[in-house]
């Protein structure tokens, strides 16, 4: 045994820890770059600051560093404990056309900090949100989940400066994030972006510096430009159907104390305070709690009660694309669903997208992008709190020695030391519900005329209608104590009832007139943009509430 231990120790000490930092030629941190030991499966990725740590068995090993849109770089470790790595853009991609503010450019003509991601990179992700699919794919762009609730939007920031301006098919969207829609008076750009069908996206371009200045003050935190897919000229009709069905499981979670460990911890704490632990629990009682076999000495596992295994998440998408000499089209429909690790939390979204472009003459083109969205999330209506957070906290706040049910009878919810965290009440049937429903319709129409001397005139009009509804019903369920002598259950209401509906409608209009001039004279390019924008929106919010006398009215018509 001693020999084996010595050998294992020697092997452990032979490993070398290598740290490093990965950036692009502008000094921008690259998040999510792959760092692997060449010829092995040993690897890691860079963090939000572009840093990485990796253990290697041989200091003469070679690291391979790669990231989308950049050349893979190899570096020998040698005696260096910290590596500074600079990745260069792949020159083969420099002739690609990139969407920028009010136009397009080739990558080699760009002077600002602009990054883009194509459709194939986005669709490798199984995220239900666009920001989630974009995570780790663009240097300087960070994403942060508000919480793990199904369908909850992910906040996106450029250089950690705050929420950017979102421009989708040329239409700008500002507004608040998805947690604040009940207070917001306009259309949330973050919501519109996160609820896009990822399969419909052709590319995402991020403007990080002065390149965003053309959008004015609203772009002070950067700009995210989204271009959706279109049909191609003389392209045959193509029908595509794809999707996935998966199961979600927690990969890591703190191990919770059982009843025996909890009781022993209390006894040891009393002893450390100079008190007599036997006054709290006798040795016989402690042994019974640790055995957990006798009535009244059961251990309760609140992790198993709150968390579920193999929770489904799915997505299905169907699209038709094609084009003739004059008309190109793209049509898609998609449905996404996700359940939470906790029961009775659910999210569903259906997307519809139609893009069509028609050349009326050789110089005159008209087109439209029409989209619709139906989105619904279901939560538990826990009194006095958030059912999702309360369910997570319940695993830590509930004591493993107290039963969720009075006398272990599942017909009676126990009156525990903190009733707001008893998971026995965390269901829509007992505590009620809080549902959010969003319906959105959007149409963008444009007309464009190309003059013969390099001038292009374009007019765009957009109409967006968003209706959001909150529907909540909190039940006054009872909590009970058990009288062992009388064999009776004594109940009291956990909280008062309430019934509420909030309806918010936002019709928004946007118009853009634009003149573009582009001319190439030998090796020189001349370009100019003249534009005019106008936008307005209406906001209507209706709030209804009452205190029902019973839990058994399924709906009150307001």
Question: Across the structure, where does each feature detected by a protein language model lie?
Answer:
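Short coil/turn segments at secondary-structure junctions
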Residues: 5, 188, 304, 315, ...
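Catalytic cores of large soluble enzymes that bind and process phosphate-bearing ligands
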Residues: 122, 126, 308, 312, ...
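Surface-exposed loop/interface segments of Gram-negative outer-membrane beta-barrel transport/assembly proteins
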Residues: 168, 179, 233-299, 340-347, ...
